[in-house]
UniProtKB/Swiss-Prot annotation:
UniProt KW keywords: Ribonucleoprotein, Ribosomal protein
Source organism of the structure: Carsonella ruddii (strain PV)
A GO molecular-function annotation: structural constituent of ribosome
Bilayer-spanning residue ranges: none
Protein family per UniProt: Belongs to the bacterial ribosomal protein bL32 family.
GO biological process: translation
Keyword Ribosomal protein on entry: yes
Domain of life of the source: Bacteria
InterPro entries per the UniProt record, alphabetical: Ribosomal_bL32 (IPR002677)
Protein name per UniProt: Large ribosomal subunit protein bL32
Entry GO terms, CC: large ribosomal subunit
Record flagged with keyword Ribosomal protein: yes
Length: 43
């Protein structure tokens, strides 16, 4: 019973990590877009 439990937690953590990376990518993209828009407004 302990082995499937370990597997489950492992896949869950992997999914969390994937989600976290995806979120970071989106945030980075938004920050870049915001900077680009501000820069364009200044120029």
């Amino acid at each position: 019973m302990a082995v499937p439990k370990q597997k489950k937690s492992k896949s869950k953590s992997r999914f969390k990590k994937k989600n976290f990376l995806l979120k970071n990518k989106i945030i980075a993209k938004n920050q870049y877009n915001n900077y680009f828009i501000k820069h364009r407004c200044l120029v």
